[in-house]
């Protein structure tokens, strides 16, 4: 139900073999390490994104090489809406190019339930504006 299955191809005992790496519980955290250009996104991340979309999960994707992963996620979501009971929405927040970004207001009063939420939001904003207070 939750597992992610990564296809593999490896050379062993003088012949090529196909297999699978099964990540049975992706909630326990996953880390993908490798040098630039080693195929981390192609071999692992893309499969995670696609399989989780097919299973109807929501995702928060940090796309360092925007729009690479965003394009894959968006197109796969368009082609596989059957995993969702409610039609999902796709949003992009792009700090490098705000013209390509959706807008949101994290301090809008509708998002605050009590004075503690307002205090914590103001405190976080002030710490980010003046790093000497940290």
Where are the regions that the model predicts?
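Switch/coupling segment of Walker-type NTPase motor domains
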Residues: 3-134
């Amino acid at each position: 139900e939750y597992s992610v299955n990564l296809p593999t191809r490896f050379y062993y005992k003088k012949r090529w073999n196909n297999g699978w790496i099964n990540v049975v519980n992706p909630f326990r955290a996953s880390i993908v390490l490798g040098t630039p250009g080693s195929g981390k996104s192609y071999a692992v991340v893309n499969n995670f994104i696609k399989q989780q979309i097919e299973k109807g999960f929501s995702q928060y994707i940090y796309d360092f090489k925007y729009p690479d992963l965003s394009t894959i996620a968006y197109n796969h979501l368009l082609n596989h809406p059957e995993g969702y009971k409610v039609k999902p929405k796709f949003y992009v927040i792009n700090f490098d190019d705000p013209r390509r970004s959706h807008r949101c207001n994290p301090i809008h009063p509708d998002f605050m339930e009590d004075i503690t939420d307002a205090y914590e939001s103001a405190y976080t904003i002030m710490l980010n504006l003046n790093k000497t207070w940290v």
